[in-house]
């Protein structure tokens, strides 16, 4: 018998994949979203099923409200929502702001911030004791870029993550008395497909630990925040960056 439903957006690779696998091991019914790679998402679901867990994959563009509604409708089919982890994120092409095109900026803000807000709203509607929910947890995957600003690379991405940090803080205060904890995790250089060639190595050398992190190390932090072990933790932003 599966436990509560665990929604993880961007759950087909990297940090999202590690979170999905870990949540399934903890007994959650996992609803993971993917943008376009159905084969990769199916592979994650198959691994969960092979280990005795339960999961489904849903194609969704989290910049689209209709897709978000469809994800949560699917989650409702499988039981009571317990956790949302918003992991969807894009950077756009690297450049200075002077050279950036508006379509890139719009896309990054729509996926990284607007999508987080809309998914947070849908989760809150289901989790809040004020609306009949049983409480639960929301975890937003932010970035150390929000602190450093990513000059010369993608300041718009950093700004979108800064907005996510504000969302975390405000929503934690808004939902604190309604049984919902809201936190964020800010990864530093992590071994994922998001980084352009050479970028990860540069970040690893800057880290006091002299290495990049792994998706599993980030996932462990996410799963802690989603668990009862973090029952008195809300409004926090845990940095997983090797000291950066």
Model-derived features with residue positions:
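Residue(s) in the substrate-gating loop at a strand-loop-helix junction
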Residues: 143
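Active-site helix of classical SDR
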Residues: 120, 160, 168
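Conserved glycine-rich cofactor-binding loop
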Residues: 12-14
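Substrate-binding pocket helix/loop in short-chain dehydrogenase/reductase
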Residues: 95-97, 101-109, 203
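Alpha-helical segment proximal to the catalytic Tyr-Lys
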Residues: 125, 173-177, 231
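C-terminal substrate-recognition "lid" of short-chain dehydrogenase/reductases
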Residues: 214-240
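Conserved glycine-rich Rossmann-like NAD(P)H-binding loop of the short-chain dehydrogenase/reductase
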Residues: 26-43
């Amino acid at each position: 018998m599966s436990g509560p439903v665990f929604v993880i957006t961007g759950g087909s690779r990297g940090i999202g994949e590690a979170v999905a696998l870990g949540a399934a091991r903890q007994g959650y019914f996992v609803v993971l979203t993917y943008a376009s790679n159905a084969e990769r998402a199916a592979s994650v679901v198959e691994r969960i099923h092979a280990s005795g867990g339960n999961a489904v994959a849903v194609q969704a563009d989290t910049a689209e409200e209709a897709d978000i509604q469809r994800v949560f409708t699917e989650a409702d089919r499988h039981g009571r929502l317990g956790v949302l982890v918003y992991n969807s994120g894009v950077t756009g092409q690297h450049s200075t702001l002077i050279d950036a095109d508006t379509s890139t900026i719009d896309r990054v803000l729509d996926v990284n911030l607007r999508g987080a807000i809309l998914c947070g709203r849908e989760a809150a509607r289901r989790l809040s004791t004020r609306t009949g929910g049983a409480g639960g947890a929301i975890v937003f995957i932010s970035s150390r870029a929000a602190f450093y600003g990513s000059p010369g690379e993608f300041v718009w991405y950093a700004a979108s993550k800064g907005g996510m940090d504000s969302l975390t803080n405000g929503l934690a205060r808004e939902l604190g008395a309604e049984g919902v904890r809201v936190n964020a995790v800010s990864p530093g250089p992590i071994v994922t497909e998001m980084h352009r060639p050479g970028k990860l190595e540069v970040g690893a050398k800057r880290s006091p630990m002299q290495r990049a992190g792994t998706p599993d190390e980030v996932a462990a932090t996410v799963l802690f925040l989603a668990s009862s072990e973090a029952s008195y933790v809300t409004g926090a932003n845990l940095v997983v960056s090797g000291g950066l």
